[in-house]
Each structure stands twice: as structure tokens, then as C-alpha cells.
Regions:
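PRPP-associated nucleotide enzymes
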Residues: 1-116
Length: 116
């Protein structure tokens, strides 16, 4: 992580210190609460542009992200790349395309890292 990005997480209060049990079951002394950073639209745009610069090397047709946490990042990355952004929502406990979103066979996607 760049010093600039880390400074933005600290500036917005999005880098939390304490004891955290992660979804993986591992423990951490620090936690990045991205929602705290993303509430600052100017900073969110800046951070997503940093991410976009790393993604420009990849060919894609669309950007896809999970609701709810990934929508802002997906939208900003899609905007910066000039690509369509779609998102998934939980349906019966699994992520699914809803709201009429479709992915063409063979389409190249950039996926938000929350997908597992």
C-alpha cells in the first residue's frame, strides 16, 4: 500500500486500531473500514482513481462488484475506465445478478475483490 493511500485511510479515520477477528478467523490489530473513507466523495474518487491506474493494463467490458459494500468502488472504477458497472445482490444466501443485469458470454470483467 502506498504511503499516500495509507495517509488517506488515517486522515478519514478509516484505519481502525484494536483487536479484530477477521472473516477468515485470523486476528488483526488493524482494520480498514472502507465505508468510513468512502463517505468522503472527493477522497473516494481519488482512491478509486489510484486503483483504476493499476487496472488500466487489463482489458475489460464491464466492472462488477457486490452490493452493498462494493457498489461505490465499482461505480467509481467503472466511471474512470469508461466502462459499464453492474453489481450483485444476495439471493438465497448467494450472490446473484438481479435487476435485469446480464453478462454476455465471453465478456471480460473486472471483479471487486470482495467476491470469494
Amino acid at each position: 500500500m502506498s504511503k499516500e493511500l495509507l495517509a488517506l485511510f488515517r486522515k478519514t479515520g478509516a484505519l481502525l486500531d484494536g483487536h479484530f477477528v477477521l472473516r477468515s478467523g485470523l486476528h488483526s490489530r488493524e482494520y480498514f473500514q472502507c465505508a468510513i473513507l468512502l463517505q468522503h466523495t472527493d477522497i473516494a474518487e481519488r482512491v478509486c482513481k489510484m486503483l483504476t491506474e493499476k487496472l488500466r493494463a487489463f482489458v475489460c467490458d464491464s466492472v462488477i462488484s457486490p452490493a452493498l459494500g462494493g457498489i461505490i468502488v465499482g461505480q467509481e472504477v467503472g466511471r474512470s475506465l469508461g466502462k459499464r458497472h453492474i453489481f450483485t445482490e444476495k439471493e438465497d444466501g448467494k450472490l446473484a445478478l438481479r435487476r435485469g443485469f446480464k453478462i454476455d458470454h465471453g465478456a471480460m470483467l473486472i471483479c471487486h475483490p470482495l467476491f470469494r
